Amino acid sequence: WVINGRKYFSSNASVASFFIVVAITDPDVPVHRGASTFLIPAGTPGLNVEATHHLFGSLPHEAGHSLIRYENVRVPASSMLGEPGHGFEILQARLAGGRIHHAMRSLGVAQRALDMMAHRAKSRFTQGSLLADKQLVQEFIADSYTELLQFRLTVLHAAWLIDTFGEHAARKEIGVCKVLASSVLKSIGMRAIQVHGALGMTEQMPLTNVLLGGVAMGLADGPTEAHKVNLARMFLKDYEAEDPEWPSEFTDVRIAAAKAKYGDRLDRIPALPRS
């Protein structure tokens, strides 16, 4: 195979010993059936790291994300992972597990931010009282705990579905986890910064990284907007269209359906509305 193209945001490419590359091998079919996965050793002729960028707030030792140019990169047939045209399936198998792992890590980060918020609220005395005694701060803590508990239970439920029925059965729940990971990190991170004041914005505290981590979670492994669209489509597949004029829960419609099912027995119900 000869591979040509460019790929941005190849994570850890600057230190990798091999690259996982998904490339179109059959352009005449839809992408999900025309992509194949290759394992390409670093240093292969034609594989060039053109630039490496780092996320804002990343640590000095992090390898960053690179722009790669593939210029007539020749690889043997044995470099293909799996069968031709199955690259999308391999990619999706990795992404499903990766997304719930993102959620698990985000849970721990959000819990730490909430702990920091609570410690600061119980410790900082200003304007005649502790922060913990001020109603707006109490609302911050209550809202954060509520969001975190919902997120935690959603992740646990998704993990149970995966363990019990497999990843395919948990597709909707994995999507929910991915959406919540971003929103919960951002909201709890922002509140934690507010409770810590200007100190929370300094490099001496990890809270800006919590907030930026929430932003990153809204982009990593697919943007939040794409996950919401896909989630809605999967959810709506379980529902059928009704009469476009009258919803099924409209009272007259329900009475007609009940009469069709139970007949004259409904006449003995005095509270039943009469049309």
Stretches found by the model and what they are:
Residues F18-V22, T37-L39, H65-N72, I90, ...:
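Conserved hydrophobic/aromatic beta-strand scaffold that supports enzyme active sites
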Residues L67-R69, H86, A93-S275:
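Alpha-helical interface subdomain recognition
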Residues N72-E89:
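Long, acidic (Asp/Glu-rich), low-complexity accessory segments flanking structured domains
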Residues P45-R74:
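Flexible, small-/acidic-enriched active-site or ligand-binding loops
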Residues N4-E50:
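A short core secondary-structure module
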Residues S10, P30, F56-E62, E83, ...:
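Short alpha-helix boundary/capping segments
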